[in-house]
UniProtKB/Swiss-Prot annotation:
Belongs to the universal ribosomal protein uL24 family. The lineage of its organism: Bacteria, Bacillati, Actinomycetota, Actinomycetes, Mycobacteriales. Pfam families: KOW, ribosomal_L24. Residues 77-105 are annotated as: Disordered. Signal peptide: none annotated. The keyword rRNA-binding applies. InterPro entries: KOW, Rib_uL2_dom2, Ribosomal_uL24, Ribosomal_uL24_CS, Ribosomal_uL24_KOW, Translation_prot_SH3-like_sf. Keywords: Ribonucleoprotein, Ribosomal protein, RNA-binding, rRNA-binding. GO terms for molecular function: rRNA binding; structural constituent of ribosome. Residues 77-93 have a biased composition (Basic and acidic residues). One of its GO terms (biological process) is translation. This is Large ribosomal subunit protein uL24. Part of the 50S ribosomal subunit. One of two assembly initiator proteins, it binds directly to the 5'-end of the 23S rRNA, where it nucleates assembly of the 50S subunit. One of the proteins that surrounds the polypeptide exit tunnel on the outside of the subunit.
Length: 105
């Protein structure tokens, strides 16, 4: 999966199309990412007591994961780009590059 935690992405399809956000969690086994402020859902939680005796519960709004195919990585110029790889000459490791301008991500 070419999108990692901490990347800034643009949502390219779905109900939040056009939204930008930071990747909070990447789930490579499920091909999903959790993006800040995108795909907000209302979760109904049961009431439970905390150690101070305050009741917590009700309807909580939180982000839900979306498919990685619905997001595009933003390059250093803030434009959506596809991701490529190249070998680093010094370390020999793969480095992600932006296909739009060829710069490292």
């Amino acid at each position: 999966m070419k999108v990692r935690k901490g990347d800034t992405v643009l949502v390219i399809s779905g109900k939040d199309k056009g939204a930008k956000g930071k990747v909070l969690v990447a789930y490579p086994d499920r091909n999903k990412v959790l993006v800040e402020g995108v795909n907000r859902i209302k979760k109904h939680t049961a009431e439970s007591r905390t150690e101070r005796g305050a009741a917590s519960g009700g309807i909580v709004t939180q982000e839900a994961p979306i498919s990685v195919s619905n997001v595009m990585l933003l390059d250093s110029d803030g434009k959506p780009t596809r991701v490529g790889y190249r070998k680093d000459d010094e370390t020999g490791k793969n480095v992600r590059i932006a296909k739009s301008n060829g710069k490292d991500l």
